[in-house]
From Swiss-Prot:
The keyword Oxidoreductase applies. InterPro entries: Aminoacid_DH-like_N_sf, NAD(P)-bd_dom_sf, THF_DH/CycHdrlase, THF_DH/CycHdrlase_cat_dom, THF_DH/CycHdrlase_NAD-bd_dom. This is Bifunctional protein FolD 1. Keywords: Amino-acid biosynthesis, Histidine biosynthesis, Hydrolase, Methionine biosynthesis, Multifunctional enzyme, NADP, One-carbon metabolism, Oxidoreductase, Purine biosynthesis. Homodimer. CDD domains: NAD_bind_m-THF_DH_Cyclohyd. It comes from Haloarcula marismortui (strain ATCC 43049 / DSM 3752 / JCM 8966 / VKM B-1809). HAMAP family: THF_DHG_CYH. Pfam families: THF_DHG_CYH, THF_DHG_CYH_C. NADP(+) binds at residues 164-166, 193, 234. It catalyses: (6R)-5,10-methylene-5,6,7,8-tetrahydrofolate + NADP(+) = (6R)-5,10-methenyltetrahydrofolate + NADPH; (6R)-5,10-methenyltetrahydrofolate + H2O = (6R)-10-formyltetrahydrofolate + H(+). Its EC number is 1.5.1.5, 3.5.4.9. Coiled coil: none annotated. GO terms for biological process: L-histidine biosynthetic process; methionine biosynthetic process; purine nucleotide biosynthetic process; tetrahydrofolate interconversion.
Amino acid sequence: MTEIIDGNAVAQSIRDDLVASIDRLADAGHRPSLATVLMSEDPASETYVSMKQDDCEEVGIEAIDIDIDSDADAAELYDTIEDLNADEDVNGILVQMPVPDHVEDRSVLRAIDPMKDVDGFHPENVGRLVAGDARYKPCTPHGIQKLIESAGVDTEGKDAVVVGRSDIVGKPMANLLIQKAPGGNATTTVCHSRTENLAERTRNADILVAAAGVPEMIDGKMIQEGATVIDVGINRVDADTEKGYELVGDVEYESAKEVAGAITPVPGGVGPMTRAMLLYNTVKATGLQHDIDVDLP
């Protein structure tokens, strides 16, 4: 019988486990804090930032909310980041993407102090990840590692296929899977929009991570029997519902769950884990900045 990997439950367990470390840091005078910077009127971005703030409140992390008008000069955003970098009471900084077209997103990521880059996207932190010495693992790939672990799947020696090569998920996910570390040691293939014979490659996967952003591009016929399937996609498609749409993943769930050994649903799979690992990185950042050992789940 296929195991449905409950991302909400795993994320809740991680949040619960973080509370003791947060309390320890607070007792030492360093309650973790996370600053989220929003420069957008996009409703989805606003909702996501609000959810992150709720997560912080649940576990006892101080949430600092900064809104910048989307029409403001890029200099206002960079000045804000500079102030947050210099503020010793701020442990983590997250600029919600996407930023407006007149702001260059890579420049924004480079502007954040690498020690406070709890998304793990600063070039220094990307380099450390590739070198096998990650300071902060990017939240979504790290959350996926935790989901695979929760399903009792040992990645060592397995064939893993990552569909998607984004800087946010695909590339760092592949890097984590190949590393000589728990949750790694897999033989890993990265597929993308130019990959030929995609189905042939995905059918060889013991572990399949679908992160291409294409609705239901992977169906049951493309999956090896018993494979662990992690669906990162969250796509809005037209549907005969009250809202006029529904959310689907990159995997056609109904056919896939008939074949997979374990699978994440959409929603309720990877999404909650991304948010939980942001809290994880914020707690880790606080410990590193104040030279305090913290127990992390």
